[in-house]
Amino acid sequence: MGGFSIWHWLIVLVIVLLVFGTKRLTSGAKDLGSAVKEFKKGMHDDDKPAGKLGDDSRTAEQAREAQAERDRDAR
């Protein structure tokens, strides 16, 4: 008596679809999926050893080296 049957959940789903519309629910589901994907990617990147950083860190390091060379040339 205390639990919901499948028919209760279907009625709730129909009401939610009527209130919010499918376009809003679809975009909300996409946003949620993207957030979960980014979270998993971030967790996976944390597991990498310090010596194996991503491409972003390499480009930042290269930019720092290039700036240091320009500073040395300017002197």
Curated annotation (Swiss-Prot):
Organism: Xanthomonas oryzae pv. oryzae (strain PXO99A)
Keyword Cytoplasm found: no
Localization per Swiss-Prot or TrEMBL: Cell inner membrane
GO BP of this protein: protein transport by the Tat complex
Protein purpose: Part of the twin-arginine translocation (Tat) system that transports large folded proteins containing a characteristic twin-arginine motif in their signal peptide across membranes. TatA could form the protein-conducting channel of the Tat system.
Family note: Belongs to the TatA/E family.
Keywords: Cell inner membrane, Cell membrane, Membrane, Protein transport, Translocation, Transmembrane, Transmembrane helix, Transport
Chain segments carrying region Disordered: 41-75
Keyword hit for Cell inner membrane: yes
Gene responsible for this protein: tatA
Protein name as it appears in the record: Sec-independent protein translocase protein TatA
GO (cellular component) term, any one: TAT protein transport complex
Organism domain of life: Bacteria
Segments passing through the bilayer: 1-21
InterPro entries associated with the record: TatA/B/E, TatA/E
UniProt subunit comment: The Tat system comprises two distinct complexes: a TatABC complex, containing multiple copies of TatA, TatB and TatC subunits, and a separate TatA complex, containing only TatA subunits. Substrates initially bind to the TatABC complex, which probably triggers association of the separate TatA complex to form the active translocon.
Membrane association type: Single-pass membrane protein
GO molecular function, one term: protein transmembrane transporter activity
